[in-house]
């Protein structure tokens, strides 16, 4: 068969962002309506290839060295020498996608350090429902084969349908990366390729945690527990997690490479990911004993200590209960006491699933909320609490906890509301090839004081954080893709502040709330408004004679000041203020000032108009000096935010991002002329809107002419 090269269609720019938001509101990105990754439609592409008799070749992730990697697996690396790309049909006469269902033996690690990903894939094989949410049915190398396959992955709040061709990296006639033990099944190798595609390359998959794979295959949120310092109610947490259909994994840390695969005296394997499949209390000689059921998906080596299959402890358990609990299949599944579990294992991971992944009506489900956000230099990247001058500019989110946990959920403890917070930074694996790795991230939780409870969702300012300590926080700031922590707090309102550790570190993030009871959430942001003074109505007689004399001197014979003359005047005046950092006013900024003040529409300023502008600039100068806190002659981007508010404008964080991008220098400094231009522009746009909003409903409608008139000449 010939190959058909398909080139993806990309949509870029602001219009794409608007289009994406509208589509999301209509349900695009849910699992049942997954986004076609890079615009590639599996059914259409497959049909086209079948019709033309060609095999699919994916130019969005082509079979070239750059798809392998950028450093250790880069184009000039010795590790990639001799690698070719071949289809399974070129390697075998009868390749298979899946044989007799997916099993752990389908997943053997190759020459890539992505065991974390393979452990997550192996866990999927234990749950057919979850597996086939990722690996859709109906794919094969026989009926309807066209060299194209697809998989569904969760990516930062959205499900995407990822198309791949079946050209796989081969060296010495064998698959370089993931392969099956039998050598004739290829679903796992193709799934790995799809995951490499969304992350930019195979090398981008090197190094990670199983929880990352769990989340991208389920859309769930993961909790980590170091068992040496686990909370006292961990057994109850495990019971609740199993009750909610969560995936649980645990492992024994290794101290060196030599420890990997080492088997302990009681037949536990170090460095392997075990699954927790059950928990039960049993009556043992008159006392209740907490048990944990485990499974080693990698083999049939089983625990031989207390409560193992052949242990004597079972002889002291009621026969009926014993039959209900005892594992009869030799499949690596076994029971052990919770006390032994805490002593023998090192770490526990719990992946809490979203309601859409849980089809059973008997399973209790989490209440979930997801927010997307950004950290941008100078506007929303304030760093952690160690930086009080800027911490307050970070994005903020409010949680309202009303319902306490059920009394029987956690025993006799004090009542409270349980929830999990998870902060995830986006696209960092994909950006490794550009030298950008994980930022150090975390979050803090603040209790809203009584006087602010129920108030509008306004962004909290610096004074609040200077006066109030955090009520809770992430366990640490760390350079992982996700930081998550379980909390239990009294009913009330709380504000969550996600941040990077240091200020001015840029990135996109997802913040997720998983609560056991319903909880109200909202993003805190200021409402856009302007407290502008009424436009002055002056006559020439009211203007000071000294100012009139100055105007006559500046305006010339026509007694009006043009844009060019205004620029000369302002730059001459500003040059005398040696304490100001400025490059002078541009013609464009002076044109904006004239447009704001020009009442008769002749493109020039008369005496009254110039007088009003002059007084306004003097006011701007006093504000500028007030917020130039270090007297450097310029303001920082964060100082500018406070200065804009002092001038009467309240803006949301997105507008501040745009303003800083447009009016600050590369070092985030804002000089006086840019500050004036910004305020003039803001006032002009607010006044235009106010004029057009005749019914005062906060909405105006433009035809194309009015839109162009406003944007081109305002």
UniProtKB/Swiss-Prot annotation:
Activated by micromolar concentrations of calcium and inhibited by calpastatin. Residues 55-354 form the Calpain catalytic domain. Its cofactor is Ca(2+). Residues 527-542 are annotated as: Linker. The keyword Iron does not apply. Disulfide bonds: none annotated. Ca(2+) 4 binds at residues 628, 630, 632, 634, 639. Ca(2+) 2 binds at residues 316, 318, 323. It catalyses: Broad endopeptidase specificity. SMART domains: calpain_III, CysPc. It is found in: Cytoplasm; Cell membrane. Binds 4 Ca(2+) ions. Calcium-regulated non-lysosomal thiol-protease which catalyze limited proteolysis of substrates involved in cytoskeletal remodeling and signal transduction. Proteolytically cleaves CTBP1. Cleaves and activates caspase-7 (CASP7). This is Calpain-1 catalytic subunit.
């Amino acid at each position: 068969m010939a190959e058909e090269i398909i080139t993806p269609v990309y949509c870029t720019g602001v219009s794409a962002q608007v289009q994406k938001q509208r589509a999301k509101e209509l349900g695009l990105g849910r699992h049942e309506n997954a986004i076609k990754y890079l615009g590639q439609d599996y059914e259409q592409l497959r049909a086209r290839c079948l019709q033309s008799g060609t095999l699919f070749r994916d130019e969005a992730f082509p079979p070239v060295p750059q798809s392998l990697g950028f450093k250790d697996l880069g184009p000039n690396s010795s590790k990639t020498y001799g690698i070719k790309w071949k289809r399974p049909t070129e390697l075998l006469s009868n390749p298979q996608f899946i044989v007799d269902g997916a099993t752990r033996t389908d997943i053997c690690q190759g020459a890539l350090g992505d065991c974390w990903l393979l452990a997550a894939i192996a866990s999927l094989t234990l749950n057919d429902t979850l597996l086939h949410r990722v690996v859709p049915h109906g794919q094969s190398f026989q009926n309807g084969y066209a060299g194209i396959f697809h998989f569904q992955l969760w990516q930062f709040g959205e499900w995407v349908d990822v198309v791949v061709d079946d050209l796989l990296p081969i060296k010495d006639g064998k698959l370089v990366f993931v392969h099956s033990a039998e050598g004739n099944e290829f679903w796992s190798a193709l799934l790995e390729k799809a995951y490499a595609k969304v992350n930019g390359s195979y090398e981008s998959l090197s190094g990670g945690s199983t929880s990352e794979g769990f989340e991208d295959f389920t859309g769930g949120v993961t909790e980590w527990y170091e068992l040496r310092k686990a909370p006292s109610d961990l057994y109850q947490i495990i019971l609740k997690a199993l009750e909610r259909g969560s995936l649980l994994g645990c492992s024994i840390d290794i101290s060196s490479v030599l420890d990997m695969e080492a088997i302990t005296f009681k037949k536990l394997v170090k460095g392997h990911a075990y699954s927790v499949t059950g928990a039960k209390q049993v009556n043992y000689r008159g006392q209740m004993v907490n048990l944990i059921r485990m499974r080693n998906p990698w083999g049939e080596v089983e625990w031989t200590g207390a409560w193992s299959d052949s242990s004597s402890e079972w002889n002291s358990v009621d026969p009926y209960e014993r039959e209900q609990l005892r594992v009869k299949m030799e499949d690596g599944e076994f029971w052990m006491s919770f006390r032994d579990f805490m002593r023998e294992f090192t770490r526990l991971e719990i992946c809490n699933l979203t309601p859409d992944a849980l089809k059973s009506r008997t399973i209790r489900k989490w209440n979930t909320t997801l927010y997307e956000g950004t950290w941008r230099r100078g506007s929303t990247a304030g760093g952690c609490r160690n930086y009080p001058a800027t911490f307050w500019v970070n994005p903020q989110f409010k949680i309202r906890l009303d319902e306490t946990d059920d009394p029987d959920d956690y025993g006799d403890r004090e009542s409270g509301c349980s929830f999990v917070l998870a902060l995830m930074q986006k696209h960092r694996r994909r950006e490794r090839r550009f030298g950008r790795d994980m930022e150090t991230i975390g979050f803090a939780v603040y209790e809203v004081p009584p006087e602010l409870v129920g108030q509008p969702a306004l962004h909290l300012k610096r004074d609040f954080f200077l006066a109030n300590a955090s009520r809770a926080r992430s366990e640490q700031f760390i350079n992982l893709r996700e930081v998550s922590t379980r909390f239990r707090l009294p009913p009330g309102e709380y504000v969550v502040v996600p941040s990077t550790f240091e200020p001015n570190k840029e990135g996109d993030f997802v913040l997720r709330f998983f609560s056991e009871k319903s909880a109200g959430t909202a993003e805190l942001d200021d409402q856009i408004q302007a407290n502008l003074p009424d436009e002055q109505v002056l006559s020439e007689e009211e203007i000071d004679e000294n100012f009139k004399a100055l105007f006559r001197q500046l305006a010339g014979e026509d007694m009006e000041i043009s844009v060019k003359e205004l620029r000369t005047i302002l730059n001459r005046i500003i040059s005398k203020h040696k304490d100001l950092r400025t490059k002078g006013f541009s013609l464009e900024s002076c044109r904006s000032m004239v447009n704001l003040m020009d009442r008769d529409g002749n493109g020039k300023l008369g005496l009254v108009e110039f007088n009003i502008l002059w007084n306004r600039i003097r006011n701007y100068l006093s504000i500028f000096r007030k917020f130039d806190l270090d007297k450097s002659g310029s303001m920082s981007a964060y100082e500018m935010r406070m200065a804009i508010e002092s001038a009467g404008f309240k803006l949301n964080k997105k507008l501040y991002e745009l303003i800083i991008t447009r009016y600050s220098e590369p070092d985030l400094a804002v000089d006086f002329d840019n500050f004036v231009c910004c305020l003039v522009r803001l006032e002009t746009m607010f006044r235009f809107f106010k004029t057009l909003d005749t019914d005062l409903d906060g909405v105006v409608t433009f035809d194309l002419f009015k839109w162009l008139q406003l944007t081109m000449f305002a």
